[in-house]
């Protein structure tokens, strides 16, 4: 980014650390260049990345997996509780939207507005989607048998193992702490297991995970790629 500002490069992406220096949001919530960038005759080009990031569950796991109502209630409670709107604001400078389906904007089949919401996690207030309240997730936890997040088998907080691929940087640590706080709303204790990508991928493929974070960037712009 600094080399770009010095004129060495014709084009550059904007890192999270430099975002506020280069971009601000106008009254309509659209990204525009800051006055300092405009004075340097820099132009802003934006595009929608055909990518999705998600939390996955091992469906063979005895706690979070399977098609029993108990496991389904637990998964839905977790999905309701993780506030991705907050995550996008804190860690992505507002660049992104909370996913309601596997198909991202810009790909045929994506639906915006009321028709595209995930009714398990969101409700429509007449103008926009609103994440269901924490009380709804807590009610599902109770139905699943984890009142206040307590595991009836141990009489202690339910422990969920969360596998991620990480290089161990400061940004990753902040994200992990944020995720712990999300599940703590339900009384769940999150055990984060961070590994290098190759090891992480092998663990997912061989079912050595319980809950994990992954993503997908389209190889080509067609919904069947998702």
Where are these regions (language model features)?
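Structural transition elements
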Residues: 64-65, 97-144, 166-174
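Sec-exported extracytoplasmic/periplasmic mature domains
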Residues: 5, 9, 24-27, 62, ...
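Extracellular/periplasmic solute-recognition and catalytic clefts
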Residues: 1-61, 85, 89-91, 98, ...
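Immediate post-signal peptide segment of exported/extracytoplasmic ligand-binding proteins
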Residues: 72, 134-161
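Periplasmic binding protein-like
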Residues: 28-32, 162, 181-226
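Short, hydrophobic beta-strand segments
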Residues: 55-61, 155-166
């Amino acid at each position: 980014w600094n080399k770009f500002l010095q004129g060495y490069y014709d084009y550059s992406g904007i890192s999270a650390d430099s975002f506020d220096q280069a971009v601000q949001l106008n009254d309509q919530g659209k990204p525009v260049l800051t006055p300092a960038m405009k004075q340097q005759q820099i132009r802003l080009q934006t595009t929608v990345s055909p990518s999705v990031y998600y939390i996955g569950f091992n469906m063979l796991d005895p706690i979070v997996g399977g098609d029993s109502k108990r496991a389904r209630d637990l998964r839905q409670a977790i999905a309701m509780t993780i506030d991705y709107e907050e995550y996008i604001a804190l860690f992505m400078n507002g660049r992104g939207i909370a996913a309601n389906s596997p198909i991202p904007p810009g790909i045929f089949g994506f639906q915006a507005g009321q028709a595209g919401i995930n009714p398990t996690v969101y409700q429509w207030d007449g103008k926009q989607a609103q994440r269901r309240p924490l009380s709804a997730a807590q009610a599902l936890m109770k139905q699943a048998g984890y009142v206040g997040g307590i595991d009836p088998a141990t009489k202690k907080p339910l422990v969920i193992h969360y596998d991620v691929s990480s290089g161990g940087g400061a940004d990753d640590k902040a994200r992990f702490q944020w995720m712990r706080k999300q599940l703590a709303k339900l009384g769940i204790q999150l055990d984060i297991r961070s590994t290098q990508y190759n090891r992480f991928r092998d663990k997912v493929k061989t079912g050595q995970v319980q809950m994990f974070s992954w993503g997908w960037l389209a190889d080509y712009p067609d919904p069947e790629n998702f």
